[in-house]
C-alpha cells in the first residue's frame, strides 16, 4: 500500500513519487491541468455517492467512464501507486485499477471502507475518477477530539501544498514534524494510522498519515482561527454566572467546548457555529452527566435547553462574523423562551467588514484558507452533518 500525495502541486507530486517510491517520471509530464482536460462536473447526488461507498467492499468493483490513460495520468500526480501492478492506495485502502476493453477504468477495492457490512456489487459511475475521489473524501469525514479518537481529515481539498521542505526518505516519516503536527512512530498501527499531537493544544488524535501532506496549511489556519477565536466566543456566551455557580459554569463551558470538532470546516461557519454547537444539547447533557461533582447535584440539566434556545434565538439575528460578538445574556432573568426578545438579550454590536481580508476567490490552482472560513458555500463536516443538495448538484 502506498500513501496518497498532495493534490495539485505538480513539482511536489513528482518530488514525492521519486523520493518515496523511486517511480519513473510520467511520459506525459506532470501538469495536472494538462493531464486531465475537460473533467466532467460531478453529476451524482450525495445519496448515489453513498451507494458508491457501500459498493466499494472487498471485491467490489466500480466502473469509471473516461479515458483510461487520462485517469492513469491523473493517478500518477495524485495517488502513489505501483506501476507494474497498478495497485494503489485509494483513500487509505488497497485497491487496483485496470483498463477495460472499452478503454474505461475498473477500480477494485481489496479492503473494506469503514468496515461497512454491505454486500458487494458493481456500480457504473458516469464521471471520472478525480470527481469520485474528491466526493468520497467529502463524504468520508469523521471529526472528533480526544486521545484515541480517529480524525479523518481526508475532505480537506488542498491544491498547493509545498512539500519541498519535507524529508520523505523514511516512508513512515517517523518523528517528522509537520507543523502543526508531530508524528510519533511508536503509535504506528496495522491500520496505517499515526498518533498525531496537536502542537497548538493539548488535544491528541489519530489520523491516517496518507492525508498529512494535504492538510498542513488549513490546520495552521484552524489553530489560529477556529480553536482560539471560536472557542473564546463559545465561552463568552456563558460569561454571566447568574443563578448558576461558577463551578457549574466551568463545567458547562467544558462540555460545550468538548462538543466542538477541533479540526473541521463547517457550512457557513460564522453564521452557524453557535447554533449547531448548542443544538447538540444531548452531547452537552451527556458530558455534564459524566462529570460527577458535588456542585452538580443541584443543577437541573433541563435548564440547558433554555439557555440553548435563548442563545440560538439571539445568534440568528447576527448576520456576519457572529463569533466576534459578545452577547450580553442575563442568566438571572426568567427563562421564558416565548416571551424573550432577542433584541433585549443581545447588545447592539456593529461589525465592520475587514477591507484587508484576502480575496475569497477559490480556484483550482490556489487554496485560500480565509475562503475556507468565510465562504457561505462550505460543507458541514460534523459527524451529524447534512448536505446542501442544491449546492452539491451545482458542483
From Swiss-Prot:
One of its GO terms (biological process) is DNA damage response. Gene3D superfamilies: E3 ubiquitin-protein ligase SopA. This is Uncharacterized protein YhaC. It comes from Escherichia coli (strain K12). The lineage of its organism: Bacteria, Pseudomonadati, Pseudomonadota, Gammaproteobacteria, Enterobacterales. The gene is yhaC.
Amino acid at each position: 500500500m502506498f500513501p496518497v500525495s498532495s493534490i495539485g502541486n505538480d513539482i511536489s507530486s513528482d518530488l514525492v513519487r521519486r523520493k518515496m517510491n523511486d517511480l519513473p517520471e510520467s511520459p506525459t509530464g506532470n501538469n495536472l491541468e494538462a493531464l486531465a482536460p475537460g473533467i466532467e462536473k460531478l453529476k451524482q447526488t450525495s445519496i448515489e455517492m453513498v451507494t458508491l461507498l457501500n459498493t466499494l467492499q472487498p471485491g467490489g468493483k466500480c466502473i469509471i467512464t473516461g479515458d483510461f490513460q487520462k485517469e492513469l495520468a491523473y493517478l500518477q500526480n495524485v495517488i502513489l501507486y505501483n506501476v507494474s501492478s497498478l495497485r494503489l492506495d485509494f483513500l487509505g485502502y488497497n485497491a487496483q485499477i485496470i483498463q477495460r476493453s472499452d478503454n474505461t477504468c475498473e477500480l477494485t477495492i481489496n479492503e473494506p471502507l469503514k468496515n461497512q457490512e454491505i454486500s458487494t456489487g458493481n456500480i457504473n459511475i458516469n464521471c471520472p475518477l478525480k470527481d469520485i475521489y474528491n466526493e468520497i473524501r467529502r463524504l468520508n469525514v469523521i471529526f472528533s477530539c480526544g486521545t484515541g479518537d480517529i480524525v479523518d481529515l481526508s475532505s480537506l481539498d488542498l491544491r498547493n501544498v509545498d512539500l519541498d521542505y519535507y524529508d520523505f526518505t523514511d516512508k513512515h516519516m517517523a518523528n517528522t514534524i509537520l507543523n502543526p503536527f508531530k508524528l510519533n512512530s511508536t503509535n504506528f498501527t496495522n491500520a496505517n494510522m499515526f498518533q498525531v499531537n496537536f502542537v497548538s493544544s493539548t488535544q491528541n488524535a489519530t489520523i491516517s498519515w496518507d492525508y498529512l501532506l494535504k492538510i498542513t496549511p488549513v490546520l495552521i489556519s484552524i489553530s489560529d482561527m477556529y480553536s482560539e477565536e471560536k472557542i473564546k466566543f463559545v465561552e463568552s456566551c456563558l460569561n454571566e454566572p447568574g443563578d448558576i455557580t461558577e463551578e457549574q459554569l466551568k463545567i458547562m463551558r467544558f462540555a460545550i467546548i468538548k462538543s466542538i470538532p477541533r479540526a473541521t470546516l463547517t457550512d457557513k461557519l460564522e453564521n452557524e457555529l453557535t447554533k449547531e454547537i448548542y443544538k447538540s444539547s444531548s452531547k452537552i447533557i451527556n458530558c455534564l452527566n459524566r462529570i460527577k461533582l458535588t456542585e452538580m447535584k443541584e443543577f437541573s440539566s433541563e435548564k440547558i435547553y433554555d439557555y440553548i434556545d435563548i442563545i440560538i434565538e439571539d445568534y440568528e439575528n447576527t448576520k456576519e462574523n457572529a463569533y466576534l460578538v459578545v452577547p450580553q445574556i442575563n442568566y438571572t432573568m426568567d427563562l421564558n423562551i416565548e416571551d424573550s426578545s432577542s433584541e433585549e438579550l443581545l447588545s447592539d454590536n456593529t461589525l465592520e467588514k475587514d477591507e484587508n481580508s484576502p480575496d475569497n476567490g477559490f480556484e483550482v490552482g490556489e487554496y485560500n484558507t480565509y475562503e475556507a472560513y468565510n465562504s457561505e458555500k462550505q460543507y458541514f463536516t460534523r459527524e451529524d452533518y447534512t448536505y446542501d443538495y442544491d449546492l452539491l448538484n451545482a458542483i
